[in-house]
Structures are given as C-alpha cells and as structure tokens.
C-alpha cells in the first residue's frame, strides 16, 4: 500500500482522537499536546471518543480542554458497560472530573454513543481530509466498521472510512512481536480493525514512548496540585509508585503518537519499512499466550512503524515544553 505520510503541521487535516482516558494518565498529556499543536498549526479537532465505559473519562476530557483554553469538542463514548472501568482505572479521573468539569458534575455533559459519534463526524467531513489518532483500544472503531447505513449516512461504516479518512496514527503493538495493552485489552476488536481497515496505519509501538518521561514533577506543592487538573492527573496516577524519586512523571506512550501525527518524519522520527501485522502470533518462550502480534515484512503492508532518531531525553524535553505551558 503506497502512501506518503503528510503530517498535520504541513497538511492540517481534521482530527478525531480516540482515547482510553483513565487507565493511564498519559492520555491527559497526549490531549494537552494535541490541543497545543492544533492552536499552533490550525487544524480542527472534530471530536474525542472515549473507548472505555468510564464516564469520569468524559469529564476529564472536558476538564483538560477547558484548562487549556478551548471549547470541548463533540464527545463520544463506548456504549457498553464494564470495559476498563474497574477501580484501577479510576486513579485520577474521578477527582479531576468532579473538581474541574462543571458539566460533568451537574450532568449536562453531552456524550454520543460511539457509532453515532463516528458516523456523524465522518458523514459531515470532507473526503480524504480526516486523520484518526488512537491512543486506546479499538472497540469504537470496530463498531464503526460494522455499522450499517442509517439516517446519518447512506454509507456503511467501511465506506465512510474509505471515503473520508486519509490515514490512522495509533499507539499500539510492539516490535518485533509481543503483547501490548491497547491490543490485548480487546484483542478481537483490534484484530478486526487491523485486518479490515482500508487506509495506512502508522504505529508508535510500546518501545517508542516507554522510556520517554514527561509530566508534572516540577509541581510538588500539594495546594497547586489540587488546583491544577493536569498536575492532579499525573500525581494521582503515580502517587503510589515507589520507583519514582519525584511523583508526577510517566512514560509517553500516547504523546509520541500525537507528536508524530503532527510533526511527521524529520529530526525526531523516521519510518520503518511497511509490514503486515500477524495476530495470534506464537511467542516461543510463552506458548500459553495467544494474544500476541508479530510484524512480518511486507512491501505492500499497510502498517508502518515509527522509529526514534534522537535520545529519549530529547523527546521528553520537547514534550515537557508543551505540557508545562498549561
């Protein structure tokens, strides 16, 4: 699949963000970066869709947008119950949503179901002018692909994607093979999307952002943390960690996907050769695990993984420079 990646800084397409806001705090940092980049380069954020059942994630999205000085865009959420909604997925977003989102507190935050969300935005978008960025699981997109014509659009979900979406950038998978959270948390949805998706998929795999540290460790005053939704997110998420000398920092898994989507190939990142992604890949040392993936070289493959060109510390500094504007 031949495709020339056009970053948002040069071709300001409309963006839809799909996030699992809650299980990890780097979704907060990724959203901050996306908002800041949108201000800089003038591309619209059409909407943000929460792929979990965690309603506090919606309030957190609203809180982050308002803290960063922008109106909260059209919101969507997975309609199912019990997905990524256990206590471990509520370390920070309950507090952030309750404290900083008035609409969440008073029950007026409007959120569409995931199919209505995607079909509405894509039906009204210009052809080939949408970039979808995913920093969570793929259940929302699986639902979109299987959706049928309705009052919103005479096109199927697959036809809408083919017509409206230029490419997808995702934080997912690991090279050369292995298990990664955004895939194994809903393996069948990821498999369906990756096998059926009709556009190129650019991947920031686990190892790209793992050791790139970013966040709010420059804020340690408890009073400031309690008044700052971004610092609260990072500090509440990391406060029980014993391996951090200073709380408030986390890996940048999702932030690197955002950074690549906007900046593209250049000093910081390059692209590897296309591959196919094999599901149900066997890991010799762990034969009991059936939900791994493996990258298989394929010149016609639609999966293109990112590669870092600079040290992790350099990327972390550039991301922190954005986060700490707010």
Model-derived segments and spans:
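Charged, glycine/proline-rich intrinsically disordered loops and linkers
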Residues: 89-100, 150-154, 283-294
